[in-house]
């Protein structure tokens, strides 16, 4: 009888019939299971919180004791490998020594008379951020065009089309059949629901300008998600240009969703000092490509102090940024010049995080798994202001330990997770639960334009709910999503990006002209998810609840990718014949590894062996409340769906589980951990996301 209670729900879930037709008979069983699981989770989280609290108290008393014995951080600041624990002291005179160690030699070397104030003399040190770069402008309802095109104010263009700069063109989708399939699949009518209007009143930003429109395409939702036309993007190549000379109308035709970026120009600098107290002007020195040092032209720029958000937390601060431990390696600064021809920074990116130089390397599967489980987020508050890069390799051999596994042109999958904001001015965390956020992305190894060294170029695929900050679901470059001074998370949250290098996922397959691309398929699935999140599947609202989140829907994209690739192979006899004919080929071995990876990932995504009904049918997204008929039982059904995929409920748990699967399949993992990097805000501290 007991076995029946567990088997019956499985049979029902696997059937194609409606979930609620059976929920009455299974109500009592479901309640017991859900309440039991919920109780277990909360008890486990409470114990974790209690242990963490005790550990912090012990650390506090240890620091107090060390302080009384005369120890100081100044003596250990000389070692690059020592992480300094910032003390939240009341005496502001000791802040620099407490946080960043002794004063930088760079700041003492500047002489005001060598500062260059000639904009033309430094113009060559700034480079455009993208070849095709512009601002999206939403047309009025009366101006709308077929295929959901939008206006595109051109900020930068290739040399051949420099005449386009400053003009407004039509940006539209290719009429290619596959592209139009994507466009039509995610186009929606938008009509705000009561839940959406309630969310608006609480401060979240929803696509108000699109409310009441019909058949809204993905370009329109990208342009119209915010209340104003402030989304700036780069266009992926190829871009087809149609120049109607007779009507002075320009059209730009694309086949991929634009990528969000910020700023017009980019430079690489080291910050020397603040020009004047209580001023946002800083003296910086540009990178010299010849000497490979920061001994180029000195210039005055502005790094504005942004206003706090509604919770009183500023996303970034310029306070003591010149004393940051990352300053010696430099910052990529993104922005544009103001009316006084002074460069105003809109986003920053520490050069160190993009470099292919690990701070630590762990060899062997056992040590690599142990690092992921216990060391990755260890003692997060003490790492404030720091960056750490770690290479995990499943191979035990250390012979080639100094050789980077990355080469120019390599592509890796990014698994992104961030934590919480603690400290006196931090956000609340009931029972110490910090959910955080999860996303996928793509990292490519490119040649740096300023230094000629190899570096990572990271692009996130943000399945992001509507929020009070105006962060838009979609593809975003690192500098836009993380480095934006006003909206980015670099300065106030701890972040972990795990970049996976596994050829069976990142390389295409060519079966005598039949091309299969797992990475392209994953990108397409995520593009569809992100577009649907912008519309809320027609409700105008994608909201996070305890049982539903971005991590569930990002995981859904992986599941859909696995099933689609598998189905294509099973349905194509030519591919199967190729695999049978070439059993020893390297491509066959890679493909077998891909299948094994898919099976392992399925165990993570659906640990109970039961496919969620919404995943099987690819219907409603977890983070979207469509306000269909609601009932007590539909709420229970949602909780059961979450329980079925319980390993993807929390971002950190999902990141760890997927990373471990990839390691076991032979992948190299490159971990980038940042902890409230940039200037110093004494009222906040980084808090690790909750995991099990």
Model-inferred region functions:
Residues 23-27, 62, 66-80, 524, ...:
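Long, compositionally biased intrinsically disordered regions
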